């Protein structure tokens, strides 16, 4: 088994129930203009089952952040690179999946396959 790794996903969206409602409506009413593909491919009204199962069955630690949380974790430098997946290792944040790759995924299965390949 591989070592436990610290994986951080950062949504290109704000957190909170009000923003969740607005984002959900935006995804369905105008999906082509929605700016968070990570949200788009991992959530419908709730977390998609395949994605949820992957996260829950993994031995890695996952953290999910929203725009307003970047400064709490010293990640302001990534504000223009969202959505993104990072790995925290030895106090540094390394990019696992950059914005371009994240935005290329058509569904959660492509994201899961990419993560399995990299982890």
Task: Provide a role label for each language-model segment.
Residues 109-119:
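Charged phosphate-binding loop/patch that engages nucleotide di/tri-phosphates or the phosphate backbone
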Residues 4-45:
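Local sequence-structure signature of Cys/Sec-based thiol-disulfide redox active-site neighborhoods
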Residues 50-81, 86:
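Thioredoxin-like thiol-disulfide oxidoreductase module
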